[in-house]
Design a protein with these regions (language model features):
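N-terminal leader/signal peptides at the extreme start of proteins
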Residues: 1-33
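N-terminal single-pass transmembrane signal-anchor helix
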Residues: 29-60, 64, 75-76
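Short, glycine/small-hydrophobic-rich surface segments
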Residues: 79-154
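Membrane-proximal amphipathic alpha-helices
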Residues: 61-73, 88-89
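Intrinsically disordered, low-complexity regions enriched in Pro/Ser/Thr/Gly and acidic residues
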Residues: 144-176, 181
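Short, low-complexity, Pro/Ser/Thr/Gly-rich segments in the mature regions of secreted, periplasmic
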Residues: 203-212
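Acidic, glycine-anchored loop motifs typical of Ca2+
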Residues: 162, 190-192
Length: 212
């Protein structure tokens, strides 16, 4: 019995000594990173960042371009649906003095002449709500009853392009019998319009789709 108790006490002492033994092994013989090692690690990280950053930025730019391309296609399709549903052209619904339909975002950009705050009408008033022509609820709305009527909202939210600028439509040409080109367009990454409102093809880094 006495021998068994000694054995138990011995085990307890050994269990108490284990952490100290571990600390002893980690103490004077253990080493952290030296200054040289830290400098080498930071240098490697810097090199990796320098290598990867252009690739990451390229993918980001491509993703933004893809989004803008899909946006102009979607807006064009929604405008065509609006015309088909109502039998009316947005160009005939513009408030006096307005010649462009613009989404949210910056307008009045440099380059070719497109819409400004003075002649841009909110595109959302045609696609999100049925209130074209002005900000009053009694404006020249699209028909709301009958076979040919406004069947929106065609989209719940119209945002700016990926670079913070508004999508634009030269809507004054979007009237019956007018054969002039009509664009849904973004000024692209540089925020400058290189495509004129009368051009039949895109220029520069502009992104757009012809409605007609």
């Amino acid at each position: 019995m006495l021998q068994q108790q000694k054995s138990i006490r011995g085990e307890k002492m050994n269990s108490k000594q284990k952490p100290d033994a571990v600390l002893d092994r980690m103490g004077p013989n253990s080493k952290g990173f030296t200054l040289v090692e830290i400098i080498v690690i930071l240098a490697v990280i810097s090199i990796l960042v320098a290598i990867l950053t252009p690739t990451v930025l390229k993918y980001i730019d491509e993703a933004r371009g893809d989004r803008a391309g899909e946006d102009v296609k979607s807006i064009s399709a929604m405008i065509n649906d609006l015309i088909k549903d109502t039998g009316k052209y947005p160009g005939n619904k513009l408030e006096s003095g307005n010649t462009f339909l613009c989404s949210t975002g910056n307008v009045g950009l440099s380059g070719q002449t497109w819409g400004t705050t003075a002649n841009c009408e909110d595109l959302a008033n045609h696609l999100v709500v049925n209130n074209p022509g002005d900000t009053a609820s009694t404006g020249d709305n699209y028909p709301s009853t009958g076979k040919f009527r406004w069947k929106g909202p065609y989209i719940t939210n119209l945002s700016e392009d990926p670079w913070g600028n508004g999508y634009q439509i030269n809507a004054s040409t979007l009237v019956g019998g007018n054969t002039s080109v009509t664009w849904v367009i973004s000024a692209g990454p540089d925020g400058t319009f290189q495509t004129s409102v009368t051009s039949t093809s895109l220029s520069g880094d502009d992104l757009g789709v012809r409605i007609k």
